[in-house]
Amino acid sequence: MATVIHNPLKALGDQFYKEAIEHCRSYNSRLCAERSVRLPFLDSQTGVAQNNCYIWMEKRHRGPGLAPGQLYTYPARCWRKKRRLHPPEDSRLKLLEIKPETSHLPGKTELITETEFITKMSVDLRRFLSCKLYTSEVDLPLKKDGFTSESTTLEALLRGEGIEKKMDTKEEDPIQEIQRVLENDENADEVNEEEDLEEDIPKRKNRPRGRPKTPTWKKIFQKNARGSGGGRRRNDAASQDDHDKPYVCDICGKRYKNRPGLSYHYAHTHLASEEGDEAREQETRSSPVHRNENHKPQKGPDGVIIPNNYCDFCLGGSNMNKKSGRPEELVSCSDCGRSGHPTCLQFTTNMTEAVKTYQWQCIECKSCSLCGTSENDDQLLFCDDCDRGYHMYCLNPPVFEPPEGSWSCHLCRELLRERASAFGFQA
């Protein structure tokens, strides 16, 4: 049976007890702060939007107990719906009747001037709008082009109907002040309408049939609730794809399973975009059909592919590399006829020498040198010395994961030996 501790301070120690109470208080504070940030949220069990509550009191809210056995009492906070005041019927808010060209007639009482009228109205409006009162709608017979318009006093002031529009700068200041106060009051009114909308929603699960209008905030919550499952599945698929293809292009975000594939993608896709716009535009004007010719390789009478006489990246020929400004021999694909400078292709010295000894293929036409097929290109390994491609499952013994660092095929290891790029990295 558990032992009752009558005096926890004596059993645990004064300092330990104070620290425990302080930790408990800080934990509760953090928990309440975190919950208040997430409010309002849609309860998945009841479908009700949970708002902040007032059950959390502080020490300064304590009062003496009122009933027997009460140690403390806290002030009650009753729910109160925001009241909307009806437009007050105040005679001071009504515009005086303006009768132009009658103040100078003999026998008539002279009315106040327009400047005095606007100044007086601005003072009255500021006084009443500061108390959150709303102006009343009055019928104001303002003559404008022979028509009578009915509007509120504020709208009449803002539109300037029945009043001459030619005023000095000092006379325009009160109207600008009225407009500023009106805009602030309208913004506050919109916020109050949204709060009342949340309070007026019936908290019932059984609703009548039909398609009642769903509030905007609830549509957002329902959309988030519905989309959580699909988003989780999409995130799982994306994480699996990230695991399968760890090499990411930092320019376009395309992923590859091995580093050689990423290198070829960068060389053939983004290297040309780093060139100057002027050089590309100039070459486009001089040879506008070059880009179209790349997609359809030209064949000679004997059926042999005719290679392009310009680099696919810098658009220079064999007589000049526009990137380095020096002449350089072109390397052409045996399948599509595309050409490129070895430096533009980021070839090493071993690659530049090796591609002259066999029918080289570009990255779009690359196939396995053992089986001769180009399928499963994500399984292709490219030699860092001769640029040949090999399926990982076609190698002997098969390779299940792309090796880290440089990799050389069996031909280059036998031919180059210690000059091979992967010398010392492969067993």
From Swiss-Prot:
Highest taxon, organism lineage: Eukaryota
The species this protein was found in: Gallus gallus
Source organism phylogeny: Eukaryota, Metazoa, Chordata, Craniata, Vertebrata
The name this protein goes by in its record: Zinc finger protein DPF3
Residue numbers spanned by region Disordered: 182-244, 272-301
Family the UniProt entry places it in: Belongs to the requiem/DPF family.
Basic and acidic residues biased stretches: 233-244, 279-296
Domain notes: The PHD-type zinc fingers mediate the binding to acetylated histones.
Function: Muscle-specific component of the BAF complex, a multiprotein complex involved in transcriptional activation and repression of select genes by chromatin remodeling (alteration of DNA-nucleosome topology). Specifically binds acetylated lysines on histone 3 and 4. In the complex, it acts as a tissue-specific anchor between histone acetylations and methylations and chromatin remodeling. It thereby probably plays an essential role in heart and skeletal muscle development. Belongs to the neuron-specific chromatin remodeling complex (nBAF complex) and plays a role in neural development.
